[in-house]
């Protein structure tokens, strides 16, 4: 028995480790693993099924086939344990050792390891400084390589063909050594002196000036450094001994009929052994060189195939033409070891079945079929049957259960009571896809699911299936109950809003119940209390929708937090009064005294959660559901064809539109508009028409005429079934109703362009053949899109999870003072997202002061902003707040609670150990399937609003300019001469209410600080022309204006005025190639004037197609227009939307034609153009210049003499995130990414909290590039984890040495995942071969910090409850006793007490 215990303890010893290291295996190491050499290719004797001696399954090498029994049967049973049979050589032990004992093959000739040879960049190639092509020629015996030049003129590593070799041999005899094949490469690698090579390279780096050379040298230095540090030897990349996998990992299974199913590896090994043995024999016979060479090459190829089949040449195929699965294929890809077995496992104690609705369940319950429950809880039932004495042995218990005796069901009830089970619906896109419930036993075979959790699971009852899992250990049950119970997951982790919200028929019922209608039975009655209302309704004295007065008593909390009763008489309806019955105490009736649409119900549950807490809300949600179902049944809403009312105006509107289209067609035929304009205008007309019809239809369906109590006929909201469904938010939308009863409208072709003939009919009228055909186009594409979308969205989620998986909350406060400055998001004058929504649940980074009061802050640093605080700030009129953000968090690993802020799913500051990275990834990835897949072609109305030509304010207040550079015109108005200028309207409190961009050349009619009224116009401009404005007064002088060459004179037929148009330089011919038409402004004497504040001459280079209306010598004043450039109706450019856009942003891809940003602040001027480019110069204040060459086809939007600030756009386009980071820094980049990604989601109506996007951005920015290495060990241009540089710099600072300087680098999520410190995590993500090769050469250690690595090695993850376990484990390593360790780990020794202890410790740490 003692031996047995020793055996168990022995196995336990290996379990505890802190890191995993990967390195190259030396031949000695491989031999030390091995239990013997495999000499024969035989596998098993197909008659006796016994393994052959010395073969691939040999029992002497790998261990016995049966437990404690040798092959020949001489020794059997436990008592001979450890004996080696002298007859068959087998050790008597467990057969399980055949899974762990390895063998080896001694290769007759060295073989290069294909991974280090072919996986790019080739490590052997870098080490030898030879090209892969050359090494392959040597390895595959096409050329000789000089290994030792001796005193000859040959170079080491020089290649010689057969002829050159023979010639050299004749010349020099034996003075030099040259060889071919892997031996030569082995020799070259063995003789490298790493240390001196290193020194030589460092000197070369210092001396070289060429970029490409530097790159190559840096790569080599890194590789050699890696070898030196890891203790690997270069020659180990060429193998002399090949390890053989344990046989049970490459099984050979006899099938019936004398055939065998075998693992491909056996074929590959057999090939290697055959060739190796043949080569050995040939060498012993000293066969001719050419034969030996061929055999060596074949050996090399067979080892290549074994390690990584198909990487070089054609893959070796098996009997059925399918490539054999090599060792590398075993670990990579979705079916490989990592993703199939280590990251995803099949679990015991689980079952699955179809789900049906369980409308009588409480929120924390689910219905579990009895049969299923009995099977799942079998061991528990057995144990209890034994304990009760109903069965003496497990066997007897089993019989009882199989017979399904009556007492079994009673015991099952007891076992199941308060034992939660977990339900999961695939695909699990976010953490709410698995939740815990208490099972309720039901008859039947389907699982019953509570309707309110359907949103979270994204489940419906059209045949969906769900899986059930049983948490077995006490800790698991505890976590399931405390963390995963459906009642603890009321709020969505993505946006902090309730996710347990009624939908569909519940909403319909509640909406029907709370509608109010004119002149219903009982209108105007007054009731003393709700009970009286109920009696009146039950006795049919009143109708549900009648407007009545009711005396209602509510519980309100006063300032001091005391509860008081408040009674008031409320105007309400019968239905709403009945609803008041189920309102929890403390929730004001006013919230329910409205029409309960889905939005209002969500608001109701939200307020309940914030004001009353979890328990009351859960009860309330259940009651709402029951009530909703009851009244939906009473309402009996159904729709018929007559509910789809077609508006009478439809005919007239269509006739008008057709007339307009005809008119444009005529204009086109008489040549007044181009084909493109005609198409755009037609599409515009039809879009507008569609909107008008839709509006008319909604008015028709949504209102009805009724007679009120006074006998007057009035309009009221109708009770049309179709309308109430859409209005309540239960089902259907205005767009869908429009197609049913309005007109179907314009259809898109599969490529996204719009068919200009709309479908004028709706579904009620029916479509004709042509209309039907037109509509199939888009419909079919929709289906194809959906299929693609799901895959794309899943892949995005996977990349996001991978990049952020190791972001965990590790400490309470990192102490940083940095943060992001938050302002409301304003677009085109509308506040899209107010400040309160953006800062809710964030921690303040700096004290917030009111304007004009710098003494006492309104909010102090480190305050968590909850609903009350946010309201306070809103009232005080605060416009900008600096909040903490994960992007600026300074925690070494993970992030701190304060930088993250509120845990959205719980509503309080986030706990230590919360895996915020994974939550962020899920929150962004989960709605991915709702995003569109398409690229929008912006043409026609699809999205182009009418040209805006002025700014009219919507609110009364005062004007504020920001970033505005303007000049004052002679008539007193201001003219904007900058591009980044903005104008905002402030209310009485100084809060910004609206903000607008001011284009260059806009005329501004009010001054900074002026008071204005709503509806007043503050600025206007010409939308069709881009002006060039003079900033000085003087006289015009034309330069390089040559009629017919650089300018063409035109006379307007109507006005008779002459104007000049600048021609396109491409059409000017050679004599004019140096002419640059410029308008210069001079004083009365003809001297050049300069632009105010600079020494640049006041001159304006005119781009092609600009028009000059002034004559040479004409006088101009400040702010006058010198020339104007006509703007073509905005070019239709493709806008990538939806999922591809989100993916592009997260992958930090550079846009196709990126915007050019100013590299520094200064004054713009233009230099001499080259052939296809224009030269733009920015001259800064100290006179230094920066040049930018810009292709001619790109539109430069700045003019000569204009002042730009660093990072401002000078050429239109989509800015590249890398440029934003480089020129403006991390915070503007974060703001840009957040804004762009949110825009995509907002368009689909998906709410995601900013902080999730920030967490991912933090991970994209975790690398930095060394710009100056200082005294550090880093190399210039190297990319390093930011944390490593900071630690190194701290060390250097302590020794008074030079720190390394660095710039932040933005990596896309795929790149960032592969660049992570943990090689296990990277290898299990993508490019497994490359990652492992790199890691092995470096001798990398994986410290198992992230979640993924720990899942793979099978430990608790360092997040949540696992974080406490790991910190205790580390503490144990530093001096706790074994028993204390067991206690903390919560081993079954004493289950209940230690859990509490560990929890208490966790709490004290917090």
Curated annotation (Swiss-Prot):
CDD domains: RNAP_beta'_C, RNAP_beta'_N. Keywords: DNA-directed RNA polymerase, Magnesium, Metal-binding, Nucleotidyltransferase, Transcription, Transferase, Zinc. Gene3D superfamilies: 1.10.132.30, 1.10.150.390, 1.10.1790.20, 1.10.40.90, 2.40.40.20, 2.40.50.100, RNA polymerase II, clamp domain (4.10.860.120), RNA polymerase Rpb1, domain 3 (1.10.274.100). This is DNA-directed RNA polymerase subunit beta'. It comes from Stenotrophomonas maltophilia (strain K279a). Belongs to the RNA polymerase beta' chain family. It catalyses: RNA(n) + a ribonucleoside 5'-triphosphate = RNA(n+1) + diphosphate. Pfam families: RNA_pol_Rpb1_1 (PF04997), RNA_pol_Rpb1_2 (PF00623), RNA_pol_Rpb1_3 (PF04983), RNA_pol_Rpb1_4 (PF05000), RNA_pol_Rpb1_5 (PF04998). DNA-dependent RNA polymerase catalyzes the transcription of DNA into RNA using the four ribonucleoside triphosphates as substrates. Mg(2+) binds at residues 460, 462, 464. One of its GO terms (cellular component) is DNA-directed RNA polymerase complex. Binds 1 Mg(2+) ion per subunit. Binds 2 Zn(2+) ions per subunit. PANTHER family: DNA-DIRECTED RNA POLYMERASE, DNA-DIRECTED RNA POLYMERASE SUBUNIT BETA. HAMAP family: RNApol_bact_RpoC. The keyword Lipid biosynthesis does not apply. Zn(2+) 2 binds at residues 814, 889, 896, 899. Zn(2+) 1 binds at residues 70, 72, 85, 88. Its EC number is 2.7.7.6. The RNAP catalytic core consists of 2 alpha, 1 beta, 1 beta' and 1 omega subunit. When a sigma factor is associated with the core the holoenzyme is formed, which can initiate transcription. GO terms for molecular function: DNA binding; DNA-directed RNA polymerase activity; magnesium ion binding; zinc ion binding. GO terms for biological process: DNA-templated transcription. Its cofactor is Mg(2+); Zn(2+).
